[in-house]
Amino acid sequence: MSQHLLLLILLSLLLLHKPISATTIIQKFKEAPQFYNSADCPLIDDSESDDDVVAKPIFCSRRAVHVAMTLDAAYIRGSVAAVLSVLQHSSCPENIVFHFVASASADASSLRATISSSFPYLDFTVYVFNVSSVSRLISSSIRSALDCPLNYARSYLADLLPPCVRRVVYLDSDLILVDDIAKLAATDLGRDSVLAAPEYCNANFTSYFTSTFWSNPTLSLTFADRKACYFNTGVMVIDLSRWREGAYTSRIEEWMAMQKRMRIYELGSLPPFLLVFAGLIKPVNHRWNQHGLGGDNFRGLCRDLHPGPVSLLHWSGKGKPWARLDAGRPCPLDALWAPYDLLQTPFALDS
């Protein structure tokens, strides 16, 4: 047996016995083109920063657009596409800073390397989210993907991001923008609103909570003094300063603890947000969250766009565009996501 063949056999045995972690990123992505500010973009300099701990002024700048997203191996392909879409449609892409949140159990260095290789010029930070504190509060929902502790990271942004970050746009990983995110970030929150998002008052709001909730005379009074409407938590503008002052993370956790004692809802991280904020948010034009393109939570069937203009397409629901494209069964609207997909195909890797 030749030495070369022996080495190949040994290598094969090593690969067979090496477990592949669920957090391992095996996909490779192309490098995105670099995008530059237009001439009228505001300058960000050292005077913009009021936090000596932060290395670059942009991470604390009020002139920057701060975007928060979660990162994990399962959705990294969607995250990369979302970032590309944000940058491509921005008038001031160099004034955008990304705040990524990854689970403590994830390979944060691998996630960081993936973003860096596709966007070497991007200003971003990866924050590690210790899920142990929230895991004890999570109750099972109608779809296992909704039970992932990282889905609850949006409730902890005020704790994870530096205190100097006062406002952030939170985005899910299964969406793309086709408009300038600065317009969304500039949403007027008024004198006291903590959160802004498109709300949908035609949706059957009662369906988001169980009969146990509505039949309880105390719990059912939760929305008595507000016009509560459904809103999707995948796209939100959040005033983190007001969030911190109002201790809203604790308020959400209180409802999650209640859910552990009596089942008052079925849909993961969404209902606690509705319980705390529904009827109190600043409404945003529906164009900023054309959601539901992933179908329902059970079958993920194809759906059409809602009537009206579109600034953001969101594949919330079970069906994800990258999975349907790979399976050769894409929905018509998945073709709008495909141009932002930076995944390197096996052919491209070999060439």
Swiss-Prot record:
Induction: By light. Gene3D superfamilies: Spore Coat Polysaccharide Biosynthesis Protein SpsA, Chain A. Residues 27-351 are lumenal. Disruption phenotype: Dwarf phenotype. Severe reduction in the mechanical strength of stems and collapsed vessels. Reduced fertility. Expressed in stems, leaves, flowers, siliques and roots. Detected in fibers and xylem cells undergoing secondary wall thickening. Its main location: endoplasmic reticulum. GO terms for biological process: cell wall thickening; glucuronoxylan biosynthetic process; leaf development; pectin biosynthetic process; xylem and phloem pattern formation. Pathway: Glycan metabolism; pectin biosynthesis. One of its GO terms (cellular component) is endoplasmic reticulum membrane. Glycans are attached at N130, N204. Residues 1-5 are cytoplasmic. It is a single-pass type II membrane protein. Its EC number is 2.4.1.-. It is found in: Endoplasmic reticulum membrane. Belongs to the glycosyltransferase 8 family. The name gaolaozhuangren came from a group of small people in a modern Chinese novel. This is Probable galacturonosyltransferase-like 1. It comes from Arabidopsis thaliana.
